[in-house]
A protein has these predicted regions:
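Sec-dependent, cleavable N-terminal signal peptides
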Residues: 1-21
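A short acidic/small-residue loop/turn micro-motif
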Residues: 112, 382, 430, 445-449
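Extended low-complexity, serine/threonine- and proline-enriched intrinsically disordered segments
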Residues: 231, 431-433
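Residue-level detector of functionally pivotal "anchor" positions at catalytic/ligand-binding pockets or at interdomain
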Residues: 397-430
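Glycine-centered tight-turn motifs at strand-turn-strand junctions
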Residues: 422, 440-452
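Short, glycine-anchored, charge-dense loop/turn motifs used at functional sites
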Residues: 434-439, 454
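C-terminal tail/sorting-segment detector
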Residues: 453-468
């Protein structure tokens, strides 16, 4: 189903976004392109993949951007400060790693992994990591492909690898891991799938199985010029023939994506799921084809997109090139170009949230579950090269964007958010909410309840919560 408006959760009116005190903005002169805020807003991990340097920020010591050891790039951070990323080793080899107790630990890799493997995402509870490995494959044109993988933390603290190299991917570069969502027993990796001749589309890995929405077809055609078939003899010399059965005729491959001839006019599909929120909304961008004819011609339309995993629903918006992240329980979406959508209405982020940056504001990269802590990219132009350099900035608002959040509980991949008159549960396949008399009051992921004490059972997680 295609939708034009975002589904509303705990909807905020525009005045509710205006904070009472001046937001605090923390900056550094260290470069970083990767920025990730932990779900609880306590930590921010930052990585500079141009210099292989990383940093971590702690809300308890907000003026300090602490450097992480080694030539490393940090991608994400869990609620307890566990960081994942990669370490650069001698010879230009990149290996996935996890930072625990201030030290990097290398994660196990597939035995056929080539020079690149990364740990890209981690669950808020720090128990599951998702990543990417480039695995050698002589059948591939580029002699290998990027495959997704996960690592699970054992009771002894060690990490066990589950690689998905058995997944049949298009004969292209593979799948790049971008985000991770755990919903009960389901482990869902969001990312970018390379396909066709030169296209990229958003895709998921759901419990080790590839899921994407585009139809990819490949064909082979003979080379024809002026009514004759192009061919090559045993010495590699080209000639042309009228014989359609000549065994030396040269055939070239082409592909269609949703019926559109990929790259025929220099246009390709572009898309990925870049991030995901606690409600299972995957944010990113995608290309859609319209008016496709039998010859493969048609119209391509690019735009930002949101895919809700639980409802299997898309929200597309061609007014933006990309949706960076959002708060699905507050109908807030952060887009490219310093814009945000509040209940579907476009706003300028700095004006709506009441802060400024010394450098050029580019976009919000990550946000805490209550919207109080934002990790953003800022930029300035290098005087020597004329190119943009990207710097991190962390914005701490006086009040959370998600109205009335009183408590956030995380356990075993399940997140329970308690707010005034409301209980939201994310990451669980089954939910039941009981009052203290044992009466079930809700079995949905969002429960509107009166003030009081409730017992929330989400899969195997049982928590007692107070609703004001």
């Amino acid at each position: 189903m295609i939708k034009n408006l975002l589904l509303s959760g705990a909807i905020l009116s525009a005045p509710a976004l205006m904070v009472n005190a001046e937001p605090k903005v923390y900056t550094t002169d260290n470069l970083a392109q990767e920025i990730h805020v932990s779900l609880n807003g306590k930590y921010v991990a930052m990585g500079d993949y141009e210099q292989n340097l990383s940093y971590i920020w702690n809300i308890d010591n907000p003026e300090t951007f602490q450097a992480l050891p080694g030539e490393s790039v940090a991608y994400e951070v869990a609620n307890d400060g566990t960081v994942v990323g990669y370490i650069k080793q001698p010879g230009g080899v990149y290996r996935p790693c996890v930072l625990e107790n201030g030290e990097w630990t290398l994660l196990p890799c597939h035995p056929a992994v080539a020079n690149t493997a990364e740990a890209n995402c981690i669950t808020p509870d720090g128990k599951i990591i998702a990543g990417t490995q480039f695995i050698n494959d002589p059948t591939s044109e580029i002699k290998g492909r990027y495959y997704p993988c996960i690592w699970k933390k054992n009771d002894d603290g060690r990490w066990t690898l589950t690689d998905y190299s058995y997944i049949k991917l298009p004969d292209h570069q593979g799948f790049l891991t971008k985000c991770l969502y755990v919903n009960g027993d389901d482990i869902i990796i969001g990312g970018r799938l390379y396909c066709g001749i030169g296209s990229e589309v958003p895709a998921l890995i759901v419990n080790g199985e590839l899921k994407f929405w585009n139809e990819i077809s490949t064909y082979s055609e003979p080379l024809i010029w002026k009514g004759q078939y192009g061919a090559y003899d045993e010495n590699g010399k080209q000639y042309f023939t009228d014989d359609p059965n000549d065994p030396n005729i040269f055939y070239y491959d082409y592909a269609t994506v949703d019926g559109y001839r990929d790259g025929e006019t220099g246009e390709y599909f572009a898309g990925e799921f870049s991030t995901v929120d606690a409600q299972g909304n995957f944010y990113g961008y995608r290309t859609r084809a319209f008016n496709v004819k039998e010859d493969g011609s048609g119209d391509l339309e690019n735009g930002a997109t949101i895919y809700n995993y639980g409802k299997d629903e898309w929200t597309d918006n061609t007014g933006f090139t990309n949706f960076a992240i959002g708060l699905g329980n507050a109908d807030i979406v952060f887009a490219n170009g310093g814009s945000m959508l509040v209940n579907g209405e476009k706003k300028k982020i700095t004006e709506e949230l009441g802060f400024t940056t010394d450098r050029i504001f580019t976009f919000v990269r990550s946000v805490s579950s209550d919207g109080k802590v934002l990790g953003i990219n800022t930029a300035e132009i290098h005087e020597g090269t004329g190119e943009y350099q990207y710097f991190p900035a962390i914005v701490v608002l006086d009040e959370p964007l998600v109205a009335g959040i009183d408590n956030v509980i995380g356990a075993d991949g399940v997140t329970i958010i308690v707010s005034e008159g409301r209980i939201d549960v994310a990451g669980a396949a089954s939910v039941a909410v009981y009052d203290l008399n044992g009466r079930k009051v809700s079995s949905s992921a969002t429960a509107h309840v009166a003030s009081g004490v409730y017992v929330v059972k989400a899969d195997d997680v049982v928590k007692k919560v107070l609703v004001k």
